[in-house]
Amino acid sequence: MIHVGNLGLDQLDIDDILFNVLKLSDYWIKRLEVPFYTLGRNAYMDGKTPEYFKESKILNPKLVDHFKDLYVNVQVYLTHLIGEQVYLNHEFAYPSFHIFESDPVFLNYPSNWHKDYPYETLGLKNDTSSSFTVVIDIPKSGAGLEYIDGEEKYLAYNVGDIIFHKGNFLHNIARLKEYVAGEYRITLQGHIIRHNDRLIMYW
């Protein structure tokens, strides 16, 4: 159901990614009244809006400039895992980041159990869709994914992990375990789908 691997990122790689996520803070979009942001647009929140396509054209080149090595690592890993070349596609938003700034509200924040259907908002309806997460930064108390596989289960995250799954089962971002000011939960988020006879990764 869920594949967990590791991209082999060292601390210098992680520090560079975090530096650039913060550097691009002008492109963070606050999604709720609580400190939850995305770096740019994504299909599941914005796929039916003109802003998704307009702003992605602006941000995609900046994402490549700042996270080229990360994209290459993800492409190589997923290509090997799936057994078919995976590409970026400029028609859609590139994979980008969930950013949660530590806040006491996340200790008891309501769950959002869901399945992944972002392709439907973009009119990409087919059976090749899958989702991935790359863990970039987590609180010292930990972070993870809750999911249903017969019963409720918990997958603990480690920095550098890449989590790959079909997205067709109930899952939920696990709540913050302990509030410590100044901590973040930052993950690269993306999806894979077949488009024009190629497997592409997008968000």
Where are these regions (language model features)?
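Non-heme Fe(II)/2-oxoglutarate
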Residues: 1-84, 96
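Residues at beta-strand starts and edge strands
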Residues: 1, 130-132, 182-186
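Short, solvent-exposed loop/turn segments at secondary-structure junctions
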Residues: 9-10, 102-104, 118, 139-141, ...
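Catalytic core of Fe(II)/2-oxoglutarate
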Residues: 144-203
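Short, Φ-rich (hydrophobic/aromatic) sequence segments
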Residues: 14-21, 78, 134-137, 186-198
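Catalytic core of non-heme Fe(II) oxygenases with the double-stranded beta-helix
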Residues: 89-95, 101-162
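Catalytic micro-motifs at enzyme active sites that drive phosphoryl/nucleotidyl and oxygen chemistry
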Residues: 83-84, 122-124, 176-177
